[in-house]
Structure formats: structure tokens, C-alpha cells
Amino acid sequence: MSGRDNRGAGGGGGGHQPLSNAMGKLKEKLTRVGDELGYHRVESNLSTSNTATSLDTILPEDPFLFPQVSPQRHPQNIVRTQLLLEDEPPLSFRPLLEDDDINEPPTQQQQRTPLRASGSLELTPLPPPPTSLEIREHRDRQQRGAQGDDLQRSKQSLKGSRVSFERRDTGNSNTNSNKAAESSDEDSFEEKRTGFQQQKATSVDHKGILKDLKHILANDNRRQFQAKKHVSLDVKGTRFLQDLLKESSSEEEFHKTRREFQGRKHQSLDPRVTFKLDKVLQGSSTDSDEEGEDAEHKRLIHRPKDITKPVIIDLKDLESESDEDFLTSRQHFQQQRSISTDSRKSRRLYEMDEMGNKRGENIRHAVPFVRQITEDGKPKLEVYRPTTNPIYIWTQVLAALSVSLGSLVVGFVSAYTSPALVSMTDRNITSFEVTQDAGSWVGGIMPLAALAGGITGGPLIEYLGRRNTILATAVPFIVSSLLIACAVNVAMVLCGRFLAGFCVGIASLSLPVYLGETVQPEVRGTLGLLPTAFGNIGILLCFVAGSFMNWSMLAFLGAALPVPFLILMFLIPETPRWFVGRGLEERARKALKWLRGKEADVEPELKGLMRSQADADRQASRNTMLELLKLNNLKPLSISLGLMFFQQFSGINAVIFYTVQIFKDAGSTIDGNLCTIIVGIVNFLATFIGIVLIDRAGRKILLYVSDIAMVLTLFVLGGFFYCKANGPDVSHLGWLPLTCFVIYILGFSLGFGPIPWLMMGEILPAKIRGSAASVATAFNWFCTFVVTKTFQDLTVAMGAHGAFWLFGAICFVGLFFVIIYVPETQGKTLEDIERKMMGRVRRMSSVANIKPLSFNM
């Protein structure tokens, strides 16, 4: 040791060169020697981490090449590196841990003056580097083993690392041991390094380390989020936590008890674990005197801790009945208790929890705003949002029934000409003459007036309100029927029909808008078909009464029908959406309370209406009619207009207006009046079939079935009339026209009859709903006028078969229109439909098989 010290002293003290030159040469020499030996110096300031996780890198131990390096934390976070280039006993290493005492006095071997890596360099006499012979021997050992690769990887990973080495007391101070000892040391090092890597999972790959760290941090954040933000959808559990918060003496006590409760209460989504939990819960029992919620909470808290451990159970060993019950329960659990770690979803869950009433009905009857988890662990993209309130059905039925009586009047007025024209053209009954041309105007003026009423109705429902506009049509309906009943000439009949048609246009516009804004999405399809059903009742009533009454008595009956409609309209409120649009928040709240029930929490729905109205106001234009031409508004308007076009050009009103005449021309062996009654009954019953199917099969499926049925029957009916006019005798097929008419009416009433009106109130945006509905209604009645006014001319020019074939071809084109353009609106709120139609949400697959919620009758 003394010889080496003398050489070091002599080398460091010779000459009078400046100290800086000596420092530079010594540093350069040490660098060159260190690089030759495979050693990488730590020269940058390495600040210590104040977190609990550090990146520890393994440096292979070599008692010859790698001297002891012991980083110590400087008060200024400077790592001091100590280089010892003298023969020492074998070294071992370990990562520098956070709990190490950095103020512990250094050992005797560590009491050396360090080289500072922070820009300044303190020089002390250092031992010379190993001789070339020693270096050569070490390189030979490198070539014999695979240690060289480990050294290179360690060299690359040393940057930025914090490594601490400590001396291993082996009891042997002689470093020049034999080769067997060296081999033993190398094997010992390999074993320790392998064990360290297995225990600490420390990778020399920085990307792997960062990936593992991110995974650890993500799991830690998730656990913290679930512990702090997790809100239980279980009503009893949530209420218990709220009571626990009040009773806890400190926040720590509350969080501790809550974590214990949540850890044992919430079940795993793993089916095997969930099934095991269910079995354990079913097997648990308590004393008979421990009943009620307190006993339930006590059982939740004092469950065995190992209850949540995964237990592998083969579902094949279970009974099939238990298996089905389990799968049903698990699906229910996933829908009602699946918690998303997304903060927005969790905030919505928290809001839903606040909505719950004392009995928790809101939570139990709701599907939450969550990304539901499928069996393969992937989230569904569709988020289905029904109401969070139980459906209070009676008030909504009363509202739908009230406006549907107006639809009954509309149906009666529309079908009036079919039985009335037969007696009106009879000079033995009528005191004035009605020519064929005048009769066509009696049938055609009503749709023309409805066109004007549809245009006028749009502004009226915006300024007067939906309810008041519907109510305003009741008295004119009575006046129009009295004008016809007391008519002494054709002019009075035409005036009465024009006034009735004008009211029909307004009513047909406002009825679907009112229902669309008052009933809940879960029953909108069912109750939305009530106006169509009552309209068909009005048609049937007109056909049946027309077979026994002349045109004047039939008009008096028409004057009596609006009376109950007028009375019931005074009992229902205005739509909450219209109140919100006028800034009448309190009246909107009262209307919602009336519609949803006094015990219902209407604040969330009211807030949704206000947000929707605010969006509509921000995007509103002074010229609403020009707003219709914007691209995002043109799409829903075009769909609505297309449905109205294909509805009317299916020829339905030509069939209804001239049913008796068509059966007479067909030469049917069945009485014409009886045929009209049969058609009316089928039309009425088919609507109720549609009511049952529309919220189960969906809108588009019913449109497909409706269109195909009409195409087939119209082509067959056209073939019958063609054969009758040009072909063989078809008198033995007198039943065929009635059969085709029944199937045709059945198909129309299932789909293209009610759905275009229903979807008009669904797909049109709120800010243009009044004007757009006005345009769609006017267009519908324009098409009705064209079809009814030109039907007789078509039969003369093309023959009856040509007219029916034309209607069938149009229906065939309508099938492709429905397939390509018409969206499915089943089970969606108006806000969701509007966002999708306006292009503000991405296209997502619909949630299948979600049934409507149970009713509180």
C-alpha cells in the first residue's frame, strides 16, 4: 500500500504546472482507462426522487474491474462518486432504498475524498490503474463466458441510475485468489443477480421499466379512484354509507369502514367469482331477531375477509336452472352496478344516486349511464339512457287519449266522402244536384285545405302552444260539420269541407308534436300510435254509420264528436318543452309533475330540456324558414318529407275515399258498404297490432313489413283489374279484391300509416320542429290532394290496373328509401335523436333487446 501511495504522490506533486492542467490530464487518463475497462462514469447531477418508486439498474459486480461506487445524497442533490482502484475484497451491491439512512457515518472503506461530478473536482492521491497483464487476464475471462453481454447492457443502462455498493465481509483480504475462487465469485454473482431480478423485477430495458411503472401507477390511481369516488348503485348500501358518515367521529374512521364495506359488498364481474359470492350470501344466516336494514348492514360489514377471493368453479357442474338464474342475475348486476372509471360517467352515476327517492325506485328502475361490460370484457359503445323515474302511466295515457280524440275527428272527416257521396248524388235524398266533377271537389278540397292548415299550424304551435293550438280546432270542427249538415247547395258543402280540412291540417301537425314532447321514451312508441288508432276508429265509425245514415245525418254525427275532445283538452297541461322555450321554468316543472307523477324527481329532465333549449337558442336564426335549408337541418326534414311522400303515394287515401266505388267497379259479389266496414275494422285492428310491436320490433322493421305487403297486394290487385278488363272471366275471383284490400290495409296500418307521423315528432330538431313539421304536414296533404283529385282521372287514362301498378312501383322505391335513409329511433330520447341527426355524435351500434320499464298503474 505504501509503494502505491508514494507513486501516487510523486505523480501528483511533480513540477510547477498549474493545478488546472494537472486536473485535466488526470481526468483524461482516468477516463481513458475507465473506458478501456468498460466502466462508465456518472458525471451529471443526479437528483434523487422523492417518490416511493425508483428506477434501479443492475451493475455486474467484478472485484477487479469495478471498484466500489457509493453514491451519497448531497444536500444540493449532487451525487458524489467514489472511485477506488486498489485491490479490495470482493464486493456486493444493492439498490439505494428510500428508507436508507443517508446520514449514517461512512465505513472505514468509504472514508475517502470523492470526485465531484458537478463541475468541480477534488484531487486526492489515487492508486494507479491495473497493469496491462491484469487487464489481459480479465479480458480472457470475459471471452470465456457470457458476462461481456451483461457488462455492455449494464453500461448502457447506467446513465441516470442510482446504485449503491457495500463491502461484503468474506473474511479474506487477499484479492489475488486462485481461478477457482474467481469462478466461485462469478457464480455467486450470477446467482445473486438472477435472484435480485426475480425479486425486484428490475429490467435493464428502460422502456420496460417505464411500462411497468405506468401500469403500477394506473392500478394505484384506479384503486384510489374507486376508494374515493366510487358511488354504489345499491340503495341500501349507499344509504348505509351516508349514515356511516354522520356517525363517524373522524374522516379516517369513515374511510376505513367504507373501504371495508365496499371491498366486501361489491361483487366481481368474473362469473365464477360472482357465483361463489352469491352462494356464500345465500348460505349466510342471522338470528331471527336481527331483521331490517340494520341486520343487513351488519352482515355486510362482518363477512369473512376471504369471501372475495377468486374461487374457480366449473359452471358445467352446476344445475342448468341455477346456471340460468346466475346468468340473469349477472346481467342485471352488470347493468345496474357496473361502475365506469370515467369521471364523467361516475359523475352521472352520482347524480343518479342523488335523484333516488326514499324507496330507491329511481335507481331500481333505471339503466345507468355506464359503458356496460360484455362477457368478453369489452365495453359496449352504445350508451342507452332511459328515464331515471318510474313510469307513472295514467297521466300520460290521459294526455294521449285527449289528443287522440282529435285524431278520431280527423279520421271521421277524412272518410266522410266515401259513404256520403253515394247518398249525396242521389236526387231522391238530396235537394240539390251534385255532379261528378262537384263530387270530386267535395272529396279533393279537404286535402287542399289541409295543406293550408299545415302551413299555418307551424307558427301557431310556436306562439300559441301545442295544447292551445289543438284546442282551437275543436270549435271549427263543430261549425264545419254543421255547415255540411244544413247545406242547401254544393257551395255550403264545399265551405264546410274546406273549414274541416283546414282544421285537419292543423291537428295532424300538432298532435304528434304534443305527444312527442309529453310522453317518456319508453312508452312514446305505444302511446304515439294512439292518435292513429283513434283515427282508424273514426274511419270505421264513419263507414258503419254511413251504411245506415244519409250524408246530412252523418254530418250531424260528425258535429257531436268534437265535444268530448273539447272537454278533455281542458284537463291536460301544455308541453313542458314549450314552457321552457318561453322561459316559464316553474310552469314547466308543474307540467312535468303532472305528467310524471307528484312523487317523481323531474329536475334532471327539466335541466335536460333547458340545456336542449339553450342549444337551440344559440343556433337559432331570425328567419326560421331559411334555417330549414341548412345542411344539418335538411337531412331530418328530407327524411320526414320522404316518408310523407311514400305514405300518400301508396294510394291509401284514394282507397279510403273511393272504397265503395272501387268495389263496385271490381264487380265483387260482396256488398260495397259491407266491404268498407270490413276494411275499416281491419284498419282499426291493425293499428293495435302496431302498438304492440312498435316498441319491440322497432320502426324500421315495421316499415319493411308494411312496404312489402303493400307492394304485393297492389300488384295483385292491378293484375285482377287487368284480367277483368282484357283477359278471361274473373267473376269466380270476386273475393280477391276484398282479400287484397284487407292485406293492403293491414300492412299500411302496421307501418306507413302511423310511423311517418310518429317520426316527424322524433327526428325534427327542436329549434325548427314547428316550422319543419308545418312543411312536412303541408307536403303530406298536398300529396293527398294530388292522389285523391287525380285518382279518377288516372283510372280513366291508365285503367284501374295502371293506377294500382303505379302505386305499387312507388311503394317498391319507398322500400329502398327506408333501408338507406330512415334511422331507427326506438328507445331514444329526443335529445339523443337530435344529436345523431345533427351529426354531433359518432355512429354507434344500438343496444339490442332492452325492454321498456315496468309501469306503475
From Swiss-Prot:
It is found in: Cell membrane. Residues 171-181, 330-341 have a biased composition (Polar residues). GO terms for biological process: D-glucose transmembrane transport; trehalose transport. SUPFAM superfamilies: MFS general substrate transporter. Residues 414-440, 495-497, 550-552, 658-673, 722-740, 789-801 are extracellular. The modification Phosphoserine is found at residues 248-250, 320, 322, 845-846. Residues 1-392, 462-473, 519-528, 574-636, 695-700, 762-767, 823-857 are cytoplasmic. Residues 134-143 have a biased composition (Basic and acidic residues). It is a multi-pass membrane protein. Residues 1-27, 92-203, 327-346 are annotated as: Disordered. Belongs to the major facilitator superfamily. Sugar transporter (TC 2.A.1.1) family. Trehalose transporter subfamily. This is Facilitated trehalose transporter Tret1-1. The lineage of its organism: Eukaryota, Metazoa, Ecdysozoa, Arthropoda, Hexapoda. The gene is Tret1-1.
